[in-house]
């Protein structure tokens, strides 16, 4: 007995050990899960949007239980009924006996386990669709009806998706219940197979018949709902979206017939529960399947093939017209002003006199090119950086509005020479200051002219909080804050030689969860997998942890229902640097509206195309404007489109999270702009839907597209992005800050694609009155060029620039040396009664610390071009010696007064002979240039160019002959000639 106990004791001990280990592992896993959830609560609580998190959690939990119970309970009931109503003395074959012997010990586990497992899967699926249920419960009427069923569009946006989802879920529950019933009845003898004979017990017959009847009823409801879904489906060879002739004449009536037939067959199954005769429901089911094939597929195909296709244009016209009107409504294009524009191509003297204000604001600083200039002139230390693409905004200076290229000096820890947890987390925590350059000016050596610059900040913006704790390049997390008596350890900004006079600061805002107890520190140590959060003495009771610092991500967390614009831009507003972010409400359920991929629509040179995006939409509104404070990360949401029914619905779900427009300050409105992503979507749709006549739309003989960016790679072309400019469109009383794009024909022929067909601009200025949006904001104006006009498009203009003998000679010579030539954005402006093209040309040396300088400006009007050192000179050259207007670079300032900044490293390396930091020698600015008839250059420049040409020829000849000594001598002469040419230009 003792021996047996000894044998059992190790087994019990091992079981106890394994049980203990299992419990410990489970507790650790649960604690990790809890830590993540608790960290979210702390973050949202400090963020001020805890209700957003809890609403999502409660809604998902509620939907989980609905899904769990909706699946598990019916499944458990049918299994229990099938088992309890089994025939007690049924004669089973040997095979079923073996099955029962295997299953019986696990019967109780299976009867509860199977419903629970299926219930969990169903609950998870239902929880993921909480938004669909919430939108159905809180749906808002749209105020318009669809043209076919005459139901409010809100039914399609909010109710129909939920109804179809609910019916689909119920159908899955009933189908799984039917399969479970059949399996249980078979295992326990309620269904017996004897040769060709199938015997079904009465109780099983009733249960199976009722479940089958319910399933067919649900299929009838599903088919009935499918009728309404036809108005949101693609049709007519994807030409339009929504029900077309075949749908209205065949598919929808056929679906109604099938729905009624399904109900009839369901009644036959219900009758069978009492009569026991399976012949009628089985025959009815077979006929239903045949009817589905004939009525649901063959008949619509025949109508389409033999009736519609021979007369498609005539029969589809009313439905195409419905699609045109719905699409323009859904994408905000209903109120667009279309103006015929008979553009002249004659560049006459004084042609720009009536457009003097627009001409003065033409931007020559390309935000996609001059980031290295900001980097070298305003970086100051390697641990600061600027984004690759800068932003365009406007500021009111001395009573007038001025376009500016702006950015913030963000922290870039990859530039630190000494990396450690202490430095990365508690010392280098934030960027510093705004940097802004005039969009229409340049210094004498081609550098940007800064209106706000330096560390500490100086310029025209006045006093504001310059520290950037929340930005697009901020570290993953930083720990900030300390007691008032403690010494500051956060580096604020450098100063003096070798950083001998560095300034330190302590974060004093409320920007992140507090680390005032060991539990919070442990939670975040687990979240970021970093034990130093617990161990470091730099963390104190006043410390805060800042994370999730990207402005777009923060707005997305505050409003998870929004689709975010791809760009956030900084502005100095009410004494703070704030990021302005645009949010959209979207849907793909708008009746008859064109469906397109959002990612495809916004892809261009500035926004790369997403390879795996699933973001088809057919409705979009810029419903929310948001700001993110760069110092403390606080987010404020404003209902920009308060009439949007989708936004109204979400406001019911998340009440008190969005402020009205009346709460927006005057300074904030001054920096609000029309969002570029929305404009890109609208232009992609307008390429086809500018045609409002259904017949013309069907023939697609006037379809447009956005031209490729002339500055993109020929091997991988991308669309030209829209550009922000202050300009006066034909019909406007004064210039406004606008966003524009151009259109060319959508055709396979290269010759036809080069012609400009349309010019779309939107008023992007929201005004400067507190709580009131300017009446013109968002007004779309389309200049439609006559088909007989042959105005060159951006691609053809770029070809003209490149093929001009004088222009190409000078630029090609520059490219042969140790310099790179970069063409800036090719701008198009409707001025002078025609279309003016402006393109800045930048030159930079090939050194690592070089940066682009503005060397020349190319302009074109009609077939004439000019190539000068400044825009003002180029316009005068283009328009017969006097354009009638003055550009912003007519009085080029001296560099010390214009650049206003230093640099890190050899910032002054340039192709123009070198400029150093905030000052330097001139790199252009002479009056030499070329019109369409050639360049009027000084003798020194011509001589230097001839010498360079000869040296290049000699070098090529030496290369072919294999004479390396002669090759080296010729190359040396080429470099000397190029430097002489640049020096001659600078005089």
UniProtKB/Swiss-Prot annotation:
Localization in the cell: Cell membrane
Gly residues: compositionally biased ranges: 897-932
Entry keyword set: Cell membrane, Membrane, Transmembrane, Transmembrane helix
Compositional bias (Low complexity): 705-719, 933-947
Keyword field contains Transmembrane: yes
UniProt record similarity statement: Belongs to the UPF0182 family.
Official protein name in the record: UPF0182 protein Lxx09300
């Amino acid at each position: 007995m003792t021996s047996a106990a000894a044998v059992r004791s190790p087994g019990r001990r091992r079981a106890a050990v394994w049980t203990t280990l299992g419990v410990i592992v489970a507790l650790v896993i649960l604690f990790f899960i809890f830590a993540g959830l608790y960290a979210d609560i702390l973050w949202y609580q400090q963020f001020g949007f805890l209700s957003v998190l809890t609403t999502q959690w409660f809604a998902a939990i509620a939907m989980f239980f609905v899904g769990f119970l909706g699946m598990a309970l019916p499944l458990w009931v049918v299994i229990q009924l099938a088992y309890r109503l089994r025939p007690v003395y049924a004669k089973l074959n040997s095979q079923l006996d073996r099955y029962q012997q295997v299953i019986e010990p696990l019967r109780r586990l299976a009867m509860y386990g199977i419903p629970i497992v299926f219930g969990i899967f169903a609950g998870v699926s239902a929880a993921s669709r909480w938004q669909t249920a919430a939108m159905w419960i809180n749906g808002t009427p749209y105020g318009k009806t669809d043209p076919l069923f005459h139901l409010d569009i809100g039914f399609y946006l909010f109710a129909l998706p939920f109804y179809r989802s609910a019916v689909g879920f119920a159908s899955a529950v009933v189908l799984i219940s039917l399969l479970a019933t059949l399996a249980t009845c078979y295992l326990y003898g309620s269904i017996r197979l004897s040769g060709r004979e199938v015997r079904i017990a009465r109780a099983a017959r009733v249960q199976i018949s009722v479940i089958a009847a319910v399933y067919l009823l649900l299929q009838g409801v599903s088919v009935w709902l499918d009728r309404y879904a036809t108005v949101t489906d693609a049709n007519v060879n994807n030409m339009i979206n929504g029900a077309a002739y075949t749908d209205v004449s065949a598919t929808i009536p056929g679906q109604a017939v099938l729905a009624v037939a399904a109900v009839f067959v369901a009644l036959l199954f219900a009758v069978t529960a009492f009569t026991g005769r399976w012949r009628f429901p089985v025959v009815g089911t077979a006929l239903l399947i045949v009817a589905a094939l004939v009525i649901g597929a063959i008949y619509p195909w025949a109508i389409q093939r033999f009736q519609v296709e021979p007369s498609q244009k005539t029969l589809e016209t009313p439905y195409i017209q419905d699609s045109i009107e719905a699409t323009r409504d859904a994408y905000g294009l209903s109120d667009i002003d279309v103006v015929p524009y008979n553009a002249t191509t004659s560049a006459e003297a004084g042609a720009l006199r009536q457009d003097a204000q627009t001409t003065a604001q033409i931007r020559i600083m390309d935000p996609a090119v001059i980031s290295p200039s900001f980097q070298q002139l305003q970086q100051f230390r390697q641990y600061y950086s600027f984004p690759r693409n800068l932003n365009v905004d406007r500021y009111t200076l001395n009573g007038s509005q001025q376009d500016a290229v702006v950015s913030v000096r963000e922290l870039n820890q990859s530039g630190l020479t000494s990396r450690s947890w202490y430095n990365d987390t508690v010392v280098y925590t934030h960027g510093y200051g705004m940097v802004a350059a005039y969009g229409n000016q340049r210094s004498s050596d081609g550098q940007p002219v800064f209106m706000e610059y330096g560390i500490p900040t100086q310029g025209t913006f006045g006093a504001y909080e310059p520290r950037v704790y929340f930005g697009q390049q901020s570290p993953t997390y930083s720990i900030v804050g300390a007691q008032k008596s403690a010494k500051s350890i956060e580096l604020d900004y450098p100063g003096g030689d070798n950083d001998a006079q560095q300034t330190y600061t302590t974060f004093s805002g409320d920007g992140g969860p507090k680390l005032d107890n060991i539990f919070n520190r442990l939670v975040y140590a687990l979240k970021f997998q970093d034990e130093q959060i617990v161990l470091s003495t730099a963390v104190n009771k006043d410390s805060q942890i800042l994370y999730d610092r990207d402005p777009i991500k923060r707005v997305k967390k505050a409003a998870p229902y929004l689709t975010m614009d791809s760009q956030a831009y900084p502005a100095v507003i009410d004494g703070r640097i704030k990021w302005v972010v645009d949010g959209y409400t979207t849907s793909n359920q708008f009746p008859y509206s064109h469906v397109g991929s959002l990612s495809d629509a916004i892809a261009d040179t500035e926004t790369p195309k997403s390879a795996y995006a699933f973001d088809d939409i057919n409705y979009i509104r810029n419903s929310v404007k948001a700001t993110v404070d760069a110092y403390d990360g606080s987010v404020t949401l404003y209902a920009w489109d308060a009439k949007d029914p989708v936004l109204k619905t979400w406001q019911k779900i998340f009440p008190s999270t969005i402020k009205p427009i009346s709460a927006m300050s005057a300074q904030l409105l001054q920096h609000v702009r029309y969002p570029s992503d929305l404009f890109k979507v609208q232009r992609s749709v307008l390429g086809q839907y500018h045609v409002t006549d259904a017949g013309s739309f069907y023939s697609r003989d006037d379809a447009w597209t956005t031209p490729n960016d002339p500055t993109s790679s020929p091997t991988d072309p991308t669309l030209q992005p829209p550009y922000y400019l202050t300009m006066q469109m034909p019909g406007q009383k004064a210039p406004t800050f606008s966003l524009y794009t151009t259109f060319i024909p959508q055709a396979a022929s290269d010759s036809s694609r080069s012609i400009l067909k349309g010019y779309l601009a939107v008023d992007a200025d929201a005004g400067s009155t507190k709580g009131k949006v300017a009446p013109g904001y968002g007004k779309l104006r389309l200049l439609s060029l006559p088909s007989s006009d042959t105005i060159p498009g951006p691609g053809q203009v770029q070809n003209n620039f490149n093929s001009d003998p004088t222009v190409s000679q000078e630029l090609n010579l520059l490219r042969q040396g140790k310099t790179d030539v970069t063409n800036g954005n090719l701008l198009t402006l409707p001025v002078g009664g025609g279309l003016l093209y402006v393109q800045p040309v930048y030159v930079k040396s090939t050194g690592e610390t070089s940066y682009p300088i503005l060397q020349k400006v190319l302009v074109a009007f009609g077939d004439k071009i000019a190539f000068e050192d400044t825009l003002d000179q180029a316009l005068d050259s283009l328009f017969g010696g006097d354009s009638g207007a003055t550009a912003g670079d007519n009085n080029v300032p001296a560099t010390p007064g214009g650049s206003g900044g230093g640099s890190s490293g050899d910032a002054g390396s340039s192709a123009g002979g070198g400029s150093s930091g905030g000052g330097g020698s001139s790199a252009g600015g002479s009056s030499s240039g070329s019109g369409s008839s050639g360049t009027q250059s000084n003798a020194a420049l011509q001589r230097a160019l001839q010498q360079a040409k000869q040296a290049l020829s000699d070098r090529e000849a030496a290369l072919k002959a294999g004479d390396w000594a002669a090759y080296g001598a010729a190359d040396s002469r080429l470099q000397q000639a190029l430097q002489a040419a640049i020096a001659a230009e600078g005089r």
